[in-house]
């Protein structure tokens, strides 16, 4: 686990096409971590942005019909410039509109990572439907990650009480985290952007690298929950930004609770 220091040194440009509700929170989180976010969406400038980018996040949280072509064009330019893409299929099990778009994106372009909760990933693999953006807590992140990897043959991050990461048919579980992440909007969306920041310039990131990304974020979240007034949602959100700024490489090795299965 050695990428955090390099990330802060390189300050990679991360293009975030993301949920309108979380743009400010996401940008501040990446700045605190050490990345350089750009919340660009205009297709006329996307080729120029992605020529210099380290990664692209596509988050469909507030997708509308007019957003589809922008996202597809951005994915095409990212593939052209060998820029890794993280797809966050927010609430893709809640409507055919969302699910069909995600499947089209996955079919037409190379996506390096799919990051979703268990319900979202189960919906993509035709195993479940969902209500809104909330995860079905009865679903196993490990089994959902395996099924999604088998279907899409790309790295999968299934988030929940225990986060499961699948790459090259290997699974790593990350047990860090806090329920407070479900009490503020954007907790999962920011995680997708953090993952994009860690995998800059890596179109096929290793299991170890993905594990470091998840551990960094979830340890910061644990620390935020234990900071002053961290059990209050408003304070927790601010604390999380602070802890992403404060966390150090050595903290990840000392505090991570991970296991391979």
UniProtKB/Swiss-Prot annotation:
Reactions catalysed, as given in the entry: 5-(2-hydroxyethyl)-4-methylthiazole + ATP = 4-methyl-5-(2-phosphooxyethyl)-thiazole + ADP + H(+)
Root EC class: transferase
Recorded name of the encoding gene: thiM
Pathway field: Cofactor biosynthesis; thiamine diphosphate biosynthesis; 4-methyl-5-(2-phosphoethyl)-thiazole from 5-(2-hydroxyethyl)-4-methylthiazole: step 1/1
Cofactor (UniProt): Mg(2+)
A GO biological process held by the record: thiamine diphosphate biosynthetic process
Protein family per UniProt: Belongs to the Thz kinase family.
NCBIfam families cross-referenced by the UniProt entry: PRK09355.1 (NF006830)
EC number, as in UniProt: 2.7.1.50
A single MF term (Gene Ontology): ATP binding
Keyword terms, alphabetized: ATP-binding, Kinase, Magnesium, Metal-binding, Nucleotide-binding, Thiamine biosynthesis, Transferase
Record-linked InterPro entries: Hyethyz_kinase, Ribokinase-like
UniProt function note: Catalyzes the phosphorylation of the hydroxyl group of 4-methyl-5-beta-hydroxyethylthiazole (THZ).
Species: Macrococcus caseolyticus (strain JCSC5402)
Chain positions recorded as ATP binding sites: 115, 159
Chain sites annotated for binding substrate: 39, 186
Protein name per UniProt: Hydroxyethylthiazole kinase
């Amino acid at each position: 686990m050695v990428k955090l220091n390099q990330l802060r040194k390189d300050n990679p440009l991360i293009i975030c096409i993301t949920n309108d509700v979380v743009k400010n929170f996401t940008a501040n989180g990446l700045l605190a971590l050490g990345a350089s976010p750009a919340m660009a969406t205009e297709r006329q400038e996307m080729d120029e942005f992605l020529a210099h980018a380290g990664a692209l996040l596509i988050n469909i949280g507030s997708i509308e019909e007019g957003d589809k072509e922008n996202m597809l064009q951005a994915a095409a330019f990212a593939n052209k410039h060998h820029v890794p893409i993280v797809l966050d299929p927010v609430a893709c099990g809640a409507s055919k509109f969302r699910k069909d778009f995600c499947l089209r994106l996955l079919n037409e372009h190379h996506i390096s990572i799919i990051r979703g909760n268990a319900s979202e990933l189960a919906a993509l693999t035709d195993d479940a439907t969902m209500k809104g953006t909330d995860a079905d807590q009865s679903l196993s992140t490990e089994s959902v990650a395996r099924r999604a990897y088998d279907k899409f043959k790309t790295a999968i991050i299934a988030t929940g009480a225990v986060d499961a990461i699948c790459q090259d048919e290997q699974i790593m579980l990350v047990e860090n985290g806090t329920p407070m992440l479900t009490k503020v909007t954007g907790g999962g969306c920011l995680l997708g952007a953090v993952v994009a920041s860690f995998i800059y310039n890596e179109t096929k990131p290793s299991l170890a690298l993905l594990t470091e990304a998840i551990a960094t974020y979830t340890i910061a979240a644990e620390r935020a929950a234990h900071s002053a007034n961290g059990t209050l949602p408003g304070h927790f959100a601010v604390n999380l930004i602070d802890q992403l700024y404060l966390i150090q490489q050595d903290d990840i090795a000392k505090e991570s609770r991970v296991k391979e299965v």
